[in-house]
Amino acid sequence: MWNKNRLTQMLSIEYPIIQAGMAGSTTPKLVASVSNSGGLGTIGAGYFNTQQLEDEIDYVRQLTSNSFGVNVFVPSQQSYTSSQIENMNAWLKPYRRALHLEEPVVKITEEQQFKCHIDTIIKKQVPVCCFTFGIPNESIIKRLKEANIKLIGTATSVDEAIANEKAGMDAIVAQGSEAGGHRGSFLKPKNQLPMVGTISLVPQIVDVVSIPVIAAGGIMDGRGVLASIVLGAEGVQMGTAFLTSQDSNASELLRDAIINSKETDTVVTKAFSGKLARGINNRFIEEMSQYEGDIPDYPIQNELTSSIRKAAANIGDKELTHMWSGQSPRLATTHPANTIMSNIINQINQIMQYK
């Protein structure tokens, strides 16, 4: 059976389909619906404070008794100068003026927030913890393992996958360059972040690690799931496929933008957050490409553009807000998450039946 392997056994799920933990876009209903359908629903905790994460976990548990996960951002060393922030604020001033916004006060609480998230995940006995932007330190991994929590890392290159396995991850998401949203890269060969496609990345990682590999990037339906399995993956992680679902927290602006976009409409940019992320191209990205200074690293740039993005989204201006999307938007639907899951499973079974 295509759905019975080490990953499904490890995560206590029926189907090796993971809903990506998209920060700001998951809801308890989405997470629970995927888990109730036999996959692994994942809370995107990247922008939550401690109370928000606790409430989200409790709400998910009211809706499902099945396994689920929490995705957290691993803090990185911020590299920035006061002049970088001043120059960026000057550049962003016209946008803020047009939207009647004040200049924000940048608050960096990433490290403390991450530690609180780990404490909450252990306290609440969340079955699975997923990491983006790097690998946590040895003591955190030890604490999570002692609590019998399964750990999933993210890799955008073979070297990152090897580092994840060496650190003690139980499985690895191989994130291809087709993936929407933030790149999970954390190793920089020759100062260039990896941009390897899913079909190239997955088998190369599979060949060098012994733990289960989860394919991600551009996978939207049963065909993508089966193709990933043929490449050696034992599961898939899908983001955009669930982002446009009725059950996600995506705005109608974002949902409509993805549904009506083409495979050539997305670009990879640092403009909004300071980390590379794939989204639908717009005026803000185009104009930021003309910025001659250094864009401050995440989370600085994320803080500096936050109010602009929120205000633009609130008035339906898709030109000044981020619209994360993978490279397969033509395959997106607005179905409920359980319908998306059943359609994927039915499509796989039909393909298997006729091959």
UniProtKB/Swiss-Prot annotation:
GO molecular function terms listed in the Swiss-Prot or TrEMBL record: nitronate monooxygenase activity; nucleotide binding
Biological processes per GO annotation: response to toxic substance
EC id: 1.13.12.-
Catalytic activity: 3 propionate 3-nitronate + 3 O2 + H2O = 3 3-oxopropanoate + 2 nitrate + nitrite + H2O2 + 3 H(+)
CDD domains per the UniProt record, alphabetical: NPD_like
EC class (word): oxidoreductase
UniProt-listed InterPro entries: Aldolase_TIM, NMO
Binding site residues for FMN: 71, 175, 180, 218, 237-240
Cofactor detail note: Binds 1 FMN per subunit.
Pfam hit, one: NMO
Keywords: Detoxification, Flavoprotein, FMN, Monooxygenase, Nucleotide-binding, Oxidoreductase
Entry cofactors: FMN
Role this protein plays: Nitronate monooxygenase that uses molecular oxygen to catalyze the oxidative denitrification of alkyl nitronates. Acts on propionate 3-nitronate (P3N), the presumed physiological substrate. Probably functions in the detoxification of P3N, a metabolic poison produced by plants and fungi as a defense mechanism.
General remark: P3N is a potent irreversible inhibitor of the key enzyme succinate dehydrogenase in the Krebs cycle and electron transport chain. P3N has been shown to be a toxic metabolite to bacteria, plants, fungi, mammals or any organism that uses succinate dehydrogenase.
Entry similarity comment: Belongs to the nitronate monooxygenase family. NMO class I subfamily.
Protein's name according to its UniProt entry: Probable nitronate monooxygenase
Protein's organism: Staphylococcus aureus (strain MRSA252)
